[in-house]
C-alpha cells in the first residue's frame, strides 16, 4: 500500500532551458537534428526520442492525413506504458512524455494540426488514452494563450497527459457504468485525485511534488466548490487550474 504523502512544498524554480541534440526519425516532426533542453521536469538529461510511425490510410482520414498524427500515436503509446508501469508497481521515466510535449510546442503550426486531431471523431477502444491526448492538446492551447514560457508549457503538458492516472484505483464497474452514479459511487470517484497524487509520489518521490499537486488539485475550483479539499484561488496549483479548465 502506498504511503501517505507529506504536505506539498512550493514548486521549485525551473532550471535553465538548455538544449540537447536528438535526431528524430524520418517522417516525424523535427527531422533535422535539433538542440533539446535539459529536462525541466527533474532528474538527469533525458534520452533520445522513441520512434512513432504514421500508418498509411486514404486522404480523407483526418488522422492519417495529419502531419502530426505520429504525436498522437506516441502520446497514446506513452499512456499505455505509464498505466502498465502502475499495474506492475514499476517506475517509468517521464523523458518520453517531455519529448512529446516539446514536439507539440516546438513548431508554431503544430498546435492547430493537433487540435484538429483532438476534435476528430475517433474510435473509442482506447478511450482513456485518447481522452488524455486530447486533454494535453487543450491544456497546451490554453497555456500558449496565456503566453506561458516553454518550461511551464512542458510541465503543463506532461501533467495533463497523465492527470487521470488515479482512476486506476477506481473499480471498473464505476468507471464504465452507463447512466447515473449513486452517491456512494460519486464519493468513490472523488477519491481519484488522492490516488493520482500517491502514485506520482510513490514513483518519483518529493522531487515531483509539483506534478503530484497538479494532479491532486485538478478538480479544485476558484470559488472553493471543488474537491477533494475545497481549495480556492491562490491555494490551487496553477497547472491544476489549466488542467481543470481543459478537462472535457
Where are these regions (language model features)?
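Conserved hydrophobic/aromatic pocket- or pore-lining residues that grip, position, or stack substrates
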Residues: 135, 139, 163, 189
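Divalent metal-dependent phosphate-bond-processing catalytic cores, especially two-metal-ion Mg2+/Mn2+ enzymes
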Residues: 144-148, 205-206, 243-246
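Short active-site segment of divalent metal-dependent hydrolases/proteases
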Residues: 166-167
